[in-house]
Amino acid sequence: MLALLVIFSYLIGSIPTGYIIVKKKFNKDIREFGSGNIGATNVGRIAGKKLSKITAICDMLKAIIPVLVTYLFLYLGLLKSNKSISLALVAISAILGHNYTLFLKFKGGKGVATSAAAFMFIVPKAFIVTAIVFFGLKLFTKVVSIRSLIAGVTLFFTTLLFGYDKYLVYATLFACLLVFWRHRANIKRLINGTEK
């Protein structure tokens, strides 16, 4: 059953919402504009704040739905696997689906909104602190990549400090490292002083 949930989570995560929204609205391939990314930030550059917010919400739902389904299966006794391991694997699968979508030759987004949503109901206290940090940093910088990288680190350390199960700590560490990996081009631009 866990294997099926992991596959389900990956497939849901793989739905390229940013690509679909821009394609339907403007008949354009978002990968050919801006950063070439299909996530909410690049959608905002091309299609405006409204569609950016819609994309972010959809990207979050791609992780929330599999996680809530997993909770339901655990509650009903349909899933006998370890709770923390099950939730960690389902969360990571949704993130990997978004970042490496099956539908666009495994080229997807950077996974910030999806990562946040994946852990929203799994490590809620850590999520709240991370959300406060992410949006609070907007007072100091408009550069989304900086806020995203700091948020990734915050999620991991707060999960650790709040004493969540070790498997959830491992999962948030993986998510954090994945955020850094997906932002490697942004990091180079930050070092060069050319990131916007």
Q: Which functions belong to the PLM regions below?
A:
Residues D29-N37, F103-A116, V143-A151:
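Short, non-helical or kinked segments that cap or interrupt transmembrane helices
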Residues A3-F8, K53, L87-I92, F127-I132, ...:
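Hydrophobic alpha-helical transmembrane segments
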Residues Y19-S52, R184, K188-K196:
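Cytosolic, membrane-interface loops and tails of multi-pass inner-membrane proteins
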Residues G44-G48, T70-L74, G109-T141, V153-F162:
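Interfacial segments of multi-pass membrane proteins
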Residues M1-K25:
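N-terminal signal-anchor transmembrane alpha helix
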Residues S9, V67-Y71, H98, L102, ...:
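Structural signal for membrane-spanning alpha-helices in multi-pass inner-membrane proteins
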